Amino acid sequence: MRRLPGGRPVSPAEVSFPDVVRRLAEASRLGQEAAYVQHGATRCLLHSVAVAYYCDCLARRLGPLGFRRLPLLRGALPHDYFLYDWHDPDPAHRLHGFRHPARALANARRDLALDPVEAEIILRHMFPLTPVPPRCREAVMVCLVDKVCSVYEIFSRRPYPNRRIQSAYALAAGEKPPDRPGGSAQPV
């Protein structure tokens, strides 16, 4: 279980999506994902933020099933933390779908202190393309939400107009959050 400074455990009610995004972005190179296109015209960072956001929404809705929200978010955000343009014809990027989970995990381990659930989420999110299935419910959720988001991004002209996703994306990318209608910034 994660602990706050001073040693107090983090309760599920204290897990805030924007706070987790901010802390991960400050501790890593997560913002660099904005430089790479993932699916369609969607940036890798926007994809990662959207996957984490929808996983968090589902985990809160399915509360009685006991999802561990902090590891869920900390594993979902860097699930595609491979930090290269897989569309380049570079031979090192061949078989990207099969290889990128291990690369993302290596990058995440270099930059972040991961617990076993977070590492499992990153490494197993490409099942069934990668042969070993996820073993924990958080990794299963990220695996499924990742597939839904990927298909949506391929067919959507402007994916994720949701202000919470856009604000979290801006936070991770080090940008100013989008304005709310009426001119004031959206609180995150």
Where on the chain are the PLM-derived regions?
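Metal-dependent phosphohydrolase cores
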Residues: 1-188
